[in-house]
C-alpha cells in the first residue's frame, strides 16, 4: 500500500482523461452537460457535487480512515446537513 503522505501529495495529480490536464483544475461551472437524456456524468449542479470537491472528499475520507466524506459549500449548509441526519427531538453533542 502507498504511504499516506505519498497518497496525499499525489491526490488530484492524475491525468484527466477528458482534458489531459495533470494538475486538478478548479471546476467553476455551475451546471454540467450530459451525453444524453437519462445518462449522467455524475455531476449535475455544483452546489451538490463537482469534480474538484469530489477529490477533496476522497482525500479527507482516506486521511480519516473512512469510506466517505462530505465537503459543503458553506458553514450553514454543513449545519443544515447535520440537522437533517437526526430526527426531531434527538439530542447530540457538538
Please describe what each predicted stretch is:
Residues 31-85:
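Conserved N-terminal alpha-helix of the aminotransferase class I/II PLP-enzyme fold
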Residues 85-94:
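Conserved PLP-anchoring active-site segment centered on the Schiff-base-forming lysine
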Amino acid at each position: 500500500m502507498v504511504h499516506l503522505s505519498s497518497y496525499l501529495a499525489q491526490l488530484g495529480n492524475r491525468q484527466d482523461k477528458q482534458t489531459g490536464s495533470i494538475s486538478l483544475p478548479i471546476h467553476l461551472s455551475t451546471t454540467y452537460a450530459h451525453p444524453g437524456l437519462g445518462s449522467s456524468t455524475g455531476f449535475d449542479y455544483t452546489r451538490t457535487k463537482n469534480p474538484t470537491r469530489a477529490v477533496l472528499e476522497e482525500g479527507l475520507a482516506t486521511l480519516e480512515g473512512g469510506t466517505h466524506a462530505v465537503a459543503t459549500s458553506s458553514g450553514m449548509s454543513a449545519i443544515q446537513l447535520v440537522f437533517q441526519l437526526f430526527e426531531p427531538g434527538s439530542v447530540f453533542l457538538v
